Amino acid sequence: MTHFPWLSTIVLFPLLASLAIPWLPDRKGTTVRWYALGVGLIDFSLIAYMFGRYYDFEQTSLQFVEDITWIDRLHLHWSLGVDGLSMPLVLLTGFITTLATLAAWPVTKNPRLFYFLMLAMYTGQLGVFVVQDLLLFFLMWELELIPVYLLVSCWGGKKRLYAATKFILYTALGSIFILLGALTMPFMGIQGVTFDMSTLAYREYSLPVEILLYTGFLIAYGVKLPAIPVHTWLPDTHGEAHYSTCMLLAGILLKMGGYALIRINMNMLPHAHALFSPWLIGVGVVNIIYAALTSFAQRNLKRKIAYSSVSHMGFVLIGIGSLSEAGLNGAMLQMISHGLIGASLFFLAGTTYDRTRTLVLEEMGGLATFMPKTFALFTACSLASLALPGMSGFFAELLVFLGLVTSEAYSPTFRAIMTVFEAIGILLTPIYLLSMLRQLFYGRSIGRPKALIDAGPREVFVVSCLLVPILGIGIYPKLATAIYVNTTDHVVQHVLSALR
C-alpha cells in the first residue's frame, strides 16, 4: 500500500477536479460550492489518512518518495517526498483550504471561476511543500501566483487592482531570483547536473557563490514571509482581498517563505546561512517591533491584522537565525500556530464586515451587545494571537525565545540585546490586539445595531475548527512538535557540522 503514489494524488487531485467546474450544471453556484468543498474534504482526508497510517515520526529522511524522469534533456524529474519540515505544512494546507472553501460560501460573483482558482492555488501550495526537484519547486511556486492575483483583482475591494498589481510585482521580482538560483546550483560542482534538493544539500560551493545564491533566495522568500522592508504588499493585499482569500494568504502562503528559508537557504547553503543568521535575527526583531507599532496605528481592521501577521512572522526569522534546535522547533511551531490564528482572525474580520459594511474601526463600537457569539470568538482568537498560555502561540514564542537565549553561536552580549528587543515586541502585542477588541466591541454603538446579525452556524463551525488545534497544541505541544522535531534537529546539526 505504501507504493501507492500518495503525494502525486494529493497534489494533482484538486487541479484535475477543478477542470470539471465549468461543466457543472449550476445557475446560482450552489453545486459549485458543494463540489469545491467536497474536493477539499476528499483531498484533506487523503492527507490525513496517509499521515495517520504511514508517516514515520522517527524518520528524518524523505518519506512517500516518488521520482519519475519527466524531461530527460532538462534533467527535470517529477520528484516528490515529505519529511518533518513539510508534513505539518501539508496538513495545515489541506485543513485551512477546506475551511476556506466553506468560508467563501457568500461569494456570488462568478463562483465557478472563484473556486477553480482556489483549487488551482491549492495544488500549487501543496506542490511547494512536497516537491524535491529545485526546478519543479520553482514551477509550483509560480503556479499559485496567478490564482492569487486573479482572486484579489476580481473579488477584492475598491483598490483591488492596485493591491493585486503590487502583489504580483513583488512576488514576480522574487521569483526571478529563485529561477536564477535554480538554474545555477545544479550546474555547479563536479558531481554532475542534478536538480535533486537532497543531493544539492550536500554539494560544496565556494563561499562567494554560496553568499550570492543565499542573497537571491533570501530576497525571494523574504517577500513571501514577509520580512521588512519587502513587506508592503501584504497590508494592501489583505486589506482588499476577500476574507476567504486572506485565510489562504495568512494561513498558507506566508508559510511558503519560512519553509523555503529552512529547506533551501538553511539546509542547502549552510555556510552562508551562518553568516546571515545574525542579520535574520535583527530583521526578525525589527519585524516584531515595527509591525506591532504600525498595527497599533491602523484604522482599518484587516490592515491591523495584516501587520500583526508581519510581527508574528518575525519570530520565524529569529528561530531560523538562532542556529539552535529549540529556536528552529519554535519557528516551525510558530508557522503552524500563526497559520491557524491568522486564518481565524481574517475570517472573523470578513464576517464582521459582511454585517457592518465597514472595516474602519472608528465606525464600529459596542458590537458585543448585539453580536455576543462573534465577540466571544474574536476574543478567543485575539488571545491566541497574543500568545496567551494554553494557546499554541505561547509555546511557539517560548521556544524561539529559549532558542535565542541558549544559542551557543552568538556572544552573550548579542543574545542579551536581541532578547530584550524581542521581549519588548512581545509586550507590544497585547497593546494593539486589546485595543482592537476595545474599538470593535466596547464603547458606544455606532450606526444601526438593531440590523446586525450575530455569527451563524457556518461562522461558528469554521472558527471552532480552527480553535480546536490552537487549544490542543497549546495544552499539549507535542501534538505538533512530534511530527517535525527529529527533522529540524537533523537540519540544525547539518548546518553546525558544515561549519566545523
From Swiss-Prot:
Q: How does it sit in the membrane?
A: Multi-pass membrane protein
Output the Gene Ontology terms for molecular function: NADH dehydrogenase (ubiquinone) activity; ubiquinone binding
Family the entry assigns: Belongs to the complex I subunit 4 family.
Protein's gene: ndhD
Taxonomic lineage from the root = Eukaryota, Viridiplantae, Chlorophyta, Nephroselmidophyceae, Nephroselmidales
Q: Which HAMAP family match?
A: NDH1_NuoM
| InterPro entries on file | NADH_Q_OxRdtase_chain4 (IPR022997), NADH_Q_OxRdtase_chainM/4 (IPR010227), NADH_UbQ_OxRdtase (IPR003918), ND/Mrp_TM (IPR001750)
**Regions that span the bilayer:** 4-24, 32-52, 87-107, 113-133, 134-154, 167-187, 211-231, 242-262, 274-294, 305-325, 330-350, 374-396, 417-437, 460-480
Write out the entry's keywords from A to Z: Chloroplast, Membrane, NAD, NADP, Plastid, Plastoquinone, Quinone, Thylakoid, Translocase, Transmembrane, Transmembrane helix
EC number(s) reported in the record: 7.1.1.-
What subcellular compartments does it reside in?
Plastid, Chloroplast thylakoid membrane
Which top-level enzyme class is recorded in the Swiss-Prot or TrEMBL entry? Answer: translocase
Please list the reactions this protein catalyses: a plastoquinone + NADH + (n+1) H(+)(in) = a plastoquinol + NAD(+) + n H(+)(out); a plastoquinone + NADPH + (n+1) H(+)(in) = a plastoquinol + NADP(+) + n H(+)(out)
Q: What is its main location?
A: plastid
Q: Name one GO cellular component term.
A: chloroplast thylakoid membrane
Give any single GO term for biological process.
ATP synthesis coupled electron transport
- Protein's name in the database: NAD(P)H-quinone oxidoreductase chain 4, chloroplastic
Superkingdom assignment:
Eukaryota
